[in-house]
């Protein structure tokens, strides 16, 4: 009787530990996935913001695809809607 109670209790403790470890791994996976997505997103933003919003003057031009308008002192996207 004592042996069966000991084995039952040991089995329940082992089951609890395995379930806890499994949930812990499942919780880490979304965190790792989100951190890798945001890391890639921040790398993209660094490349995109290379010229957009940089201060400019008429002597120092902007990158290709950007213009330095007369009204503002920073580089903006060139487009057909701009005069």
UniProtKB/Swiss-Prot annotation:
It is found in: Secreted. Expressed by the venom gland. One of its GO terms (cellular component) is extracellular region. Residues 1-21 form the signal peptide. Coiled coil: none annotated. The keyword Cytoplasm does not apply. Disulfide bonds join 51-63, 56-68, 62-75. The presence of a 'disulfide through disulfide knot' structurally defines this protein as a knottin. Agglutinates erythrocytes. This is U5-theraphotoxin-Hs1d. It comes from Cyriopagopus schmidti (Chinese bird spider).
């Amino acid at each position: 009787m004592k042996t069966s109670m000991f084995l039952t209790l040991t089995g329940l403790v082992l089951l609890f530990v395995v379930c806890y470890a499994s949930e812990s791994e499942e919780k880490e996976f979304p965190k790792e996935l989100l951190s890798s997505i945001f890391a890639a997103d921040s790398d993209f933003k660094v490349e995109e913001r290379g010229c957009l919003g940089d201060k400019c003057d008429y002597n120092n031009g902007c990158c290709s695809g950007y213009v330095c308008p007369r009204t503002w002192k920073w580089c903006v996207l060139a487009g057909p809607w701009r005069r």
